[in-house]
């Protein structure tokens, strides 16, 4: 990613999202799904933070709260306004005027390029809609802006695409349209929710390269949501690993991948496929299934599956995420403040790519 001034663009503090479980029309809910629980992180200008974890861990819910598609139960999200350079408290935005202003700085690229577009609208209408909603430019100016963006995202020549419909495009072309729609307002922060997961492998790398190039050209900051560590390594400056609503490890990409500390991160890395079919990577074994996210006890969320759990893990609250050497943070009772493992013998990871 491009080196900018190191200014914090996104600051998340104690973010929490609880979904009540309905008990009927006249009974108050006492049980809650802790989808996101006390999540905090910062993203600097020009950086890309990868939010990694298995399905259901709270990645997408976190992203939706950052762009105010979902309201938080608790916590704060501050995002720097592109126009005034001031930090906006996202959860306090209420009026339509403030929401429209907020959308100029923040956008989202959705996972499914087949479901996130209105099939009855042309490509021009889809990409130009944010400009129309904001009342920006004349029809001719909007058309020129759309043409320029289609060219920028690699749909050339752009003119034949303007009056096509989504069903006339391939999956890769639709995702390029989704990227163009997200960038038409020139946002400074974009949440990308697994934008390549539904595309053919042959197309994924071109979309990822495109997003990196646009970050360099336009200075866009990304929160990149993915379950694929290989994608996160290619796309992101930093990675945060999420498990059952909690961030369990976070750090610079190479530091985290070369020296994973949390048992869950190590298990994820050991499961990454190796290109050499004759080589079998040593597996980090974890037992059981993911624990229930309904009213979870105040313990380590990974306790039920961790092969190294000790009495401290069972008796103490979930460990805080704090630095264990450099900018590398991990939430584990068995990692010392210097980043040393004290939890017993582990399988040595062979991280050959």
Q: Which ranges hold each PLM region?
A:
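Short catalytic/signature loops enriched in Gly
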Residues: 3-8, 22-27, 32, 87, ...
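The feature captures the beta-strand-to-loop junction immediately N-terminal to the Walker
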Residues: 52-53
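ABC ATPase NBD Q-loop/coupling interface
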Residues: 76-101
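Conserved ABC ATPase "signature" region
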Residues: 86, 141-160, 213, 269
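Conserved ABC ATPase signature
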Residues: 164-169, 173
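A short, proline-enriched helix->beta-strand linker immediately N-terminal to the Walker B motif
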Residues: 184-188
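P-loop NTP-binding/switch modules centered on Walker-like glycine-rich loops
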Residues: 191, 195, 199, 203-281
């Amino acid at each position: 990613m491009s080196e900018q001034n190191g200014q914090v663009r996104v600051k998340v503090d104690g973010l929490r999202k609880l979904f009540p479980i309905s008990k009927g029309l006249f009974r108050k809910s006492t049980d809650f799904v802790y989808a996101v629980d006390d999540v905090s992180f910062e993203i600097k200008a020009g950086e890309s933070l990868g939010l990694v974890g298995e399905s259901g861990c709270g990645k997408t819910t976190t992203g939706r709260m950052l762009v105010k598609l979902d309201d938080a139960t608790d916590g704060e999200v501050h995002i720097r306004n592109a126009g005034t350079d001031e930090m906006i408290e996202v959860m306090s935005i209420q009026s339509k005027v403030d929401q429209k202003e907020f959308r100029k700085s923040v956008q989202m690229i959705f996972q499914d390029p087949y479901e996130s577009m209105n099939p009855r609208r042309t490509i021009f209408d889809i990409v130009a809609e944010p400009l129309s909603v904001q009342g920006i430019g004349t029809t001719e100016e909007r058309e020129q802006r759309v043409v320029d963006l289609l060219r920028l995202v690699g749909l050339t020549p752009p003119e034949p695409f303007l009056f096509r419909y989504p069903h006339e495009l391939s999956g890769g072309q639709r995702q390029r349209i989704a990227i163009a729609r997200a960038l038409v307002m020139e946002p400074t922060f974009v949440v990308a929710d697994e934008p390549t997961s539904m595309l053919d492998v042959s197309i994924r790398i071109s979309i990822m390269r495109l997003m990196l190039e646009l970050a360099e050209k336009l200075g866009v900051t990304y929160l990149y949501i993915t379950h694929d560590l290989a994608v996160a390594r290619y796309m992101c400056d930093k990675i945060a690993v999420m498990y059952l609503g909690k961030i369990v490890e976070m750090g610079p990409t190479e530091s985290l991948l070369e020296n994973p500390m949390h048992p869950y991160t190590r298990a994820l890395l050991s499961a990454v496929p190796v290109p050499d079919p004759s080589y079998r990577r040593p597996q980090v074994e974890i037992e059981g299934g993911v624990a229930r996210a309904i009213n979870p006890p105040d313990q380590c969320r990974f306790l039920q599956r961790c092969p190294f759990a000790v009495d401290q893990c069972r008796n103490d609250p979930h460990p805080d995420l704090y630095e264990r050497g450099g900018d590398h943070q991990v939430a584990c009772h068995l990692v010392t403040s210097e980043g040393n493992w004290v939890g017993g013998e582990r399988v040595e990871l062979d991280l050959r790519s």
